[in-house]
């Protein structure tokens, strides 16, 4: 069965934000790609790096690796960080490891990591 682009677009438009985030994650894993625009700049940085001596990374991705033993404080922290509702934040936390924020500054990434680690979560910055 072949789906038309319009049918796929209509199906996606009826999905919740959480379902769309999970779909994007599944597509990234299946095809080995990333939806982050920072990867385009990463390719440009590699080209520039080969021409110059050193390029410093300026955009970072914050990844919730695991929630630890205390799920409720982690859900509250994720809600405040992402602005999601309770159910969406809970679903997101339970699907760890998951990307929480992309293309953030080093300071913001460190602050998010400290916040999440203070409530028992394991966080990775890439």
Curated annotation (Swiss-Prot):
It comes from the Bacteria. Homodimer. Part of the ribosomal stalk of the 50S ribosomal subunit. Forms a multimeric L10(L12)X complex, where L10 forms an elongated spine to which 2 to 4 L12 dimers bind in a sequential fashion. Binds GTP-bound translation factors. SUPFAM superfamilies: ClpS-like, Ribosomal protein L7/12, oligomerisation (N-terminal) domain. GO terms for molecular function: mRNA binding; structural constituent of ribosome. One of its GO terms (biological process) is translation. GO terms for cellular component: cytosolic large ribosomal subunit. It comes from Blochmanniella floridana. This is Large ribosomal subunit protein bL12. Forms part of the ribosomal stalk which helps the ribosome interact with GTP-bound translation factors. Is thus essential for accurate translation. Keywords: Ribonucleoprotein, Ribosomal protein. Gene3D superfamilies: 3.30.1390.10, Single helix bin (1.20.5.710). Belongs to the bacterial ribosomal protein bL12 family. It holds the Pfam family Ribosomal_L12.
């Amino acid at each position: 069965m072949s789906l038309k682009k319009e049918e796929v677009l209509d199906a996606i438009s009826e999905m919740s934000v959480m379902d769309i985030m999970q779909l994007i994650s599944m597509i990234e894993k299946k095809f080995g790609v990333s939806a982050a625009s920072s990867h385009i700049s990463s390719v440009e940085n590699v080209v520039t790096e080969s021409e110059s001596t050193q390029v410093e990374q300026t955009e970072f991705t914050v990844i919730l690796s695991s929630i630890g033993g205390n799920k409720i404080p982690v859900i509250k922290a994720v809600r405040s960080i992402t602005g999601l509702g309770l159910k969406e934040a809970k679903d997101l936390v339970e699907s760890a490891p998951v990307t929480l924020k992309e293309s953030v500054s080093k300071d913001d990434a460190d602050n998010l990591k400290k916040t999440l680690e203070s409530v028992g979560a394991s966080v990775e910055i890439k």
